[in-house]
Regions:
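Extreme N-terminal leader/anchor segments
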Residues: 1-61, 75, 109
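Alpha-helical bundle segments that constitute or directly flank the non-heme di-iron/ferroxidase center
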Residues: 72-103, 122
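Amphipathic alpha-helical hairpins
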Residues: 96, 108-130
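Generic serine detector
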Residues: 43, 62-63, 84, 91, ...
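Conserved small/polar residues in nucleotide/adenosyl-binding loops
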Residues: 131-135
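Active-site-adjacent bridging/hinge elements
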Residues: 57-70, 94-95
Length: 135
């Protein structure tokens, strides 16, 4: 069984032939060349991720702020616990995805991980915005 290897920051001896590119344990240069991708699904994933992008300031929460105090205690408790769990998940994902990327040797796939990391940070921000409902 092969051992997982972290990719180098730059490898001048890495493979430039896209046919030799591997998702894990490849001989990557670690240079981005998104015109030559081994994994073409990345383009569709990238477009979808960018189309789904939003920021918390775009969401009007004024009715949520009014509705929260009117929820029954059990629903407020459920809401608070779910929100805290989602903040936890976003935090773990934001911290963990770069560590996974250290082992991905197909740069186009690392693009996906970078975008997901960024969007998890935004999710964390939006979750924190929702904690103001409880104030």
């Amino acid at each position: 069984m092969n051992e997982l290897r972290k990719k180098p920051l730059f490898n001048p001896e890495g493979d430039t032939d896209v046919r030799l590119r591997r998702m894990i344990n490849g001989n990557t240069t670690n240079l981005n060349d998104f015109n030559n991708m081994r994994y073409p699904w990345v383009s569709d994933w990238y477009r979808q991720a960018m189309n789904n992008f939003w920021i918390p300031e775009e969401i009007n929460m004024s009715s949520d702020i009014k509705d929260y105090p009117e929820l029954p205690e059990a629903e407020r408790t459920a809401y608070d616990k779910i929100l805290s769990f989602l903040i936890f998940l976003d935090s773990i994902q934001t911290a963990n995805l770069p560590h996974i990327g250290e082992y991905i040797t197909a740069n186009e796939v690392n693009l996906c991980l970078s975008i997901q990391t960024f969007q998890e940070c935004v999710h964390s921000q939006s979750s924190v915005s929702y904690t103001h409902l409880r104030a």
